Amino acid sequence: MFEDAMVPIESYEIDPHPNYTLFKLHTKKGTVPLYTSLEVNENLRREFRRPITHDIITGVVAGFDLKIMKCIIDHVEDSIYFAKLYLDRSGEEIVSIDIRPSDVLILLKTTKFPLFVSQKVLDATAQEGI
């Protein structure tokens, strides 16, 4: 769908601050800064006794025999990032769901899939030296 406009996220860093968490999403073409709440960093670091949203997503994906194909951070508006998670339904169809990029980063803790940023988001937000 966005094949020619996707740039792979090669790595990311977590930079916690007193009032927010900064994720630095690194591509070959620049770094995209993604600011999130402190709660996102906490969800990445802690083990929870009960399932949180990301555990439930993983369970639903497995329970319905879905496979996460990729995620694309495809839009930014007023400093808010938007993403789509692409799911393969047993080879029958690929569906996309709207998802917050911060949720994707937590989901990547337990599930491996490619993460991309659209060229238009990269052009609008990329910074060097952060």
Residue map of PLM features:
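Divalent-cation
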Residues: 1-130
